[in-house]
């Protein structure tokens, strides 16, 4: 009986963090790597975990490792902490997540973050067909090839878009191992620098050195060049608004002139009617002339 209680107590101590994580209602932490999640071999990287002001300890878990993989206290007056890796090696490559502990219990785990090490193998070569300068809407093919028998290749677009494509490698007799990435109907957002890497299936976070870079330039077709861009559309809208305002001002000005003209004509008609009335009165007065009448005769004869 005592042995059974001891086993149950041991299991409770082991499962306590997991159970608390599932039952907790604390804010979910956020994990990220600096300067990035794809790191060259033997360079340093910092894994950040952002959680809560109430956090007392932060825990970092690594997939397929004894967890917690690392533990840190919060930075002074901060709601986050950092886990330092001074020299990146293949043993640090993998999938990580973090969580924290507060007086209220354990938080849930953050989203998973994949930390990749590059430089473990020789670099593959990258080529593009038909050209690195094409018009929008055209299909192009990137070919990543290597003499190393990689199981998979990954094509990455560097920069703000951060697009990536992964394919299984193709093996043919007397030819390098390769993978062909087809981009149908390329668009301006595909502009940028591309590189590819090779890796083995059993170590998906341990990559080769980067291939040679290829700069892809996508130009617009004639039809697309006639289509206003966002900046062009904004300018077009401003011009259209200005034209409409001008038409409205001209309309109100014309309406004002019409009203003024109408009032002037109405006033002239009123003045003309007054003048006609005065002319008729003058005519009646002029029609009576005392010289045209006989002088009045005297009723009495002189003595």
From Swiss-Prot:
PROSITE patterns: IG_LIKE (PS50835). GO terms for cellular component: cell surface; plasma membrane. Residues 261-303 are cytoplasmic. Keywords: Cell membrane, Disulfide bond, Glycoprotein, Immunity, Immunoglobulin domain, Membrane, Receptor, Repeat, Signal, Transmembrane, Transmembrane helix. Residues 42-123, 124-212 form the Ig-like C2-type domain. Residues 24-238 are extracellular. The chain crosses the membrane at residues 239-260. Residues 1-23 form the signal peptide. InterPro entries: Ig-like_dom, Ig-like_dom_sf, Ig-like_fold, Ig-like_Receptors_ImmuneReg. GO terms for biological process: mast cell activation. It holds the Pfam family Ig_2. Gene3D superfamilies: Immunoglobulins. It is a single-pass type I membrane protein. Its main location: membrane. It is found in: Cell membrane. Disulfide bonds join 49-98, 144-196. Expressed on mast cells (at protein level). Also expressed at much lower levels on natural killer cells (at protein level). Glycans are attached at residues 79, 133, 191. Monomer and homodimer. PANTHER family: LEUKOCYTE IMMUNOGLOBULIN-LIKE RECEPTOR SUBFAMILY B MEMBER 4A-RELATED (PTHR11738:SF181), MHC CLASS I NK CELL RECEPTOR (PTHR11738). Plays a role in mast cell activation. This is Leukocyte immunoglobulin-like receptor subfamily B member 4B.
């Amino acid at each position: 009986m005592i042995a059974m209680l001891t086993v149950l107590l041991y299991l409770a101590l082991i499962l306590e963090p997991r159970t608390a994580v599932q039952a907790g209602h604390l804010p979910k932490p956020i994990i990220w790597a600096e300067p990035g999640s794809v790191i060259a071999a033997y360079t340093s990287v910092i894994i950040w975990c952002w959680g809560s002001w109430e956090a007392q300890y932060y825990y970092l878990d690594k997939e397929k490792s004894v967890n917690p993989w690392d533990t840190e206290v919060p930075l002074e007056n901060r709601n986050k902490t950092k886990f330092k890796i001074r020299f990146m090696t293949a043993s640090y490559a993998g999938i990580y997540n973090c969580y924290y502990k507060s007086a209220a219990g354990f938080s849930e785990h953050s989203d998973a973050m994949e930390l990749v090490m590059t430089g473990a193998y020789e670099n593959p070569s990258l080529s593009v067909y038909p050209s690195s300068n094409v018009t929008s809407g055209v299909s192009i093919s990137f070919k990543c090839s290597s003499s190393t028998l990689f199981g998979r290749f990954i094509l990455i677009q560097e920069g703000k878009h951060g697009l990536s494509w992964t394919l299984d490698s193709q093996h043919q007799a007397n030819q390098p191992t390769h993978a062909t990435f087809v981009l149908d109907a390329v668009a301006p957002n595909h502009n940028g620098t591309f590189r590819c890497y090779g890796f083995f299936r059993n170590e998906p976070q341990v990559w080769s050195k980067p291939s040679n870079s290829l700069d892809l330039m996508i130009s617009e077709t004639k039809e697309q060049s006639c289509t206003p861009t966002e900046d062009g559309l904004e300018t077009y809208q401003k011009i259209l608004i200005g034209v409409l305002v001008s038409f409205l001002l001209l309309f109100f000005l014309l309406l004002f002139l019409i009203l003024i003209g109408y009032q002037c004509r109405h006033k002239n008609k009123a003045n003309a009617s007054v003048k006609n009335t005065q002319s008729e009165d003058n005519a009646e007065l002029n029609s009576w002339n005392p010289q045209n009448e006989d002088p009045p005769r005297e009723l009495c004869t002189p003595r």
